């Protein structure tokens, strides 16, 4: 009888020891995964801060920030889901009895799921590198409206189409170079043109005045509305030219099947183009400009 009790006690002790080792191993693995989650969240936060700093410096515009935020939100959602699983595991691992009871049914599957997420960490970091590299090279190109449009015009005349193509060619070339650097990734390139107007009015009763009213679908409009509309029409006209230029250069993009291109043309009206310039006037050629931005982001 004593031998049976001794053997039973030894067996119980061995089971307890094995259980403690498994619990300790699970806790250690979970701690490492949670540390990685925190590190990745810090990386995402750092990129967001970098993007906002670039926005304040006029190196990028709000459209680019929105797209970066949307891309980072995908990763944040994945990390939040992983952290929720980690929290569930932490609750179970607090109690040895609960751990032993749920080890095979809950603990191991959750650890396996978290480990798979962790194994893709290097892959996600490489995507963050693309975003950070894009922010490092980000800048705007400025063009005077007079280079493309006649006074009071919003369509590029035939004799200035080649000038527009030459002006925008370096922009497309820079975008192409960056895109090709990361051609192994599925990615989206965004070209943005923002049109601006100064504070001078548009003569009432003229052809342009009535054309803009037709575009606005209004019988009359304030100066600000008219300037907003003409800046929008000019931006869209330049986007059309940019699209044609891209199509001519499309064969220069590597792995083009992994690349999507989107174009955004927006009129900013009488908004001030560059926040760091503090001495803009109402009638000011520095406000009659177009700003061009681009970004390439991993999908």
Ranges and model annotations:
Residues 2-299:
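N-terminal targeting segments with Sec-dependent signals, encompassing both cleavable signal peptides
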């Amino acid at each position: 009888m004593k031998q049976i009790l001794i053997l039973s006690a030894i067996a119980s002790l061995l089971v307890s020891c094995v259980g403690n080792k498994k619990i300790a191993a699970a806790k250690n693995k979970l701690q490492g995964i949670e540390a990685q989650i925190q590190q990745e969240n810090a990386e995402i936060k750092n990129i967001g801060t970098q993007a906002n700093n670039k926005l304040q410096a006029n190196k990028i515009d709000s459209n680019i920030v929105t797209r970066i935020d949307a891309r980072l939100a995908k990763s944040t959602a994945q990390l939040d889901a992983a952290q929720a699983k980690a929290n569930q595991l932490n609750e179970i691992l607090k109690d040895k009895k609960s751990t032993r009871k749920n080890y095979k049914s809950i603990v191991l599957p959750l650890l396996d799921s978290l480990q798979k997420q962790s194994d893709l960490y290097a892959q996600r970091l490489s995507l963050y590198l693309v975003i950070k590299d894009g922010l490092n090279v980000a800048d705007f190109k400025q063009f005077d409206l007079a280079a493309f449009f006649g006074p009071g015009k919003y369509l590029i005349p035939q004799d200035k189409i080649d000038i527009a193509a030459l002006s925008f060619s370096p922009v497309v070339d820079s975008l192409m170079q960056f895109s090709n650097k990361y051609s192994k990734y599925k990615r989206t390139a965004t070209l943005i043109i923002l049109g601006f107007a100064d504070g001078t009015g548009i003569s009432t009763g003229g052809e342009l005045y009535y054309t803009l009213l037709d575009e606005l679908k209004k019988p009359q409009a304030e100066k600000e509305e008219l300037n907003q509309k003409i800046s929008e029409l000019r931006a869209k006209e330049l986007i059309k030219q940019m699209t044609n230029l891209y199509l001519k250069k499309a064969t220069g993009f590597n792995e083009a099947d992994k690349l999507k291109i989107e174009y955004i043309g927006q009129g900013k009206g009488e908004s001030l183009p560059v926040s760091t310039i503090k001495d803009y006037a109402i009638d000011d050629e520095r406000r009659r400009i177009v700003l061009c931005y681009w970004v390439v982001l991993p999908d």
